[in-house]
Structure formats: structure tokens, C-alpha cells
Design a protein with these regions (language model features):
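Surface-exposed, interaction-prone regions used to assemble/regulate multi-protein complexes
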Residues: 3-156
């Protein structure tokens, strides 16, 4: 086969572009199906506690005691979205509030995590919130410039 293109083209004459891969985030633990019951705030740090710990993602999926810490939370960019009727598509009603206001105003709650998303300085949880005998879909966005730390009991 004779190839007469330039070094910036492939065999079909298409200009090659540089490809950079953002590796998938493989967290050692998941909060999927865990029930968040408390946010403790110390300065710009959040300690998020669940009713029954965390689940390891190493294939065994063992449940372990633990909680999650977020450091250097940027409160002006951290939000909670409370969406109306759960599980439906189409139009909805809801409320957006600062995460700090949510933590201050809603003390007794259960937030069942269904999905976790990790991005650049951002952790997002989607799930269902139960508070004051109300049930709604909920999205919690935590913008943190510091580390996210999974704290577990070392049973070795």
C-alpha cells in the first residue's frame, strides 16, 4: 500500500487530532443505597454520616463502618435541589437552596443516595429525601477545593 499523506493525516486523509483521556474515577467506596443522616460542619469542612457506613467497591461489596469528609467546601457554589413529586418525568416544581442553609434548617432527615457523580472539585449525590413526613427527589452538590476523604475502621 502506498501512503502519500502528511504525518498529521491518517490513511483515509483525515487530520489526526491529539486525544487526551480523562480516566474514569474509581472510588474505593460507594454510598449507593446508603442513608445519609447527618452533616456536621466545622469551618469550611463537612463530615457526612450515613446510617450504616459505606460499601467497598473492590468486587466483594462489603459494607464497612465509616463516613465521608469534604475539605475546603466553597459554600457559595454548593447547593441542594428539592424536586417535587418523585420518580416522574415532565414538568416539576422545586426549590434550590444553599447547602449551608439546608444543613442549618433541616436537622432531622434521611437522604437515600441513588447515584454519585465526581468531577473537578465537585461531588454530586442524587437520591430521595425524607424530612418532616415529606418525600422528594433531591440533588446535593458539594463544591470542595480540598480532598474528599473516606474514613473507615481499619480491621486489619
Amino acid at each position: 500500500m502506498c501512503y502519500n499523506g502528511t504525518e498529521n493525516e491518517n490513511l483515509w486523509g483525515v487530520i489526526l487530532l491529539k486525544r487526551s483521556i480523562r480516566n474514569n474515577i474509581n472510588s474505593p467506596y460507594t454510598l449507593h443505597d446508603m442513608n445519609v443522616i447527618e452533616f456536621e460542619v466545622t469551618g469550611n469542612n463537612i463530615f457526612m454520616k450515613t446510617q450504616s457506613g459505606l460499601v467497598e467497591t473492590d468486587g466483594v461489596c462489603r459494607q464497612v463502618d465509616g463516613y465521608v469528609e469534604f475539605y475546603n467546601v466553597q459554600w457559595d457554589f454548593s447547593f441542594v435541589y428539592l424536586l417535587g413529586v418523585t420518580g416522574n418525568t415532565g414538568t416539576f416544581t422545586g426549590e434550590k437552596m444553599f447547602l449551608k442553609d439546608f444543613i442549618s434548617n433541616i436537622r432531622t432527615f434521611g437522604f437515600s443516595v441513588m447515584d454519585e457523580t465526581y468531577g473537578y472539585n465537585m461531588t454530586k449525590y442524587n437520591g430521595f429525601l425524607l424530612y418532616n413526613k415529606k418525600h422528594c427527589e433531591c440533588v446535593i452538590e458539594i463544591y470542595h477545593e480540598g480532598d474528599m476523604v473516606f474514613v473507615t475502621e481499619d480491621k486489619k
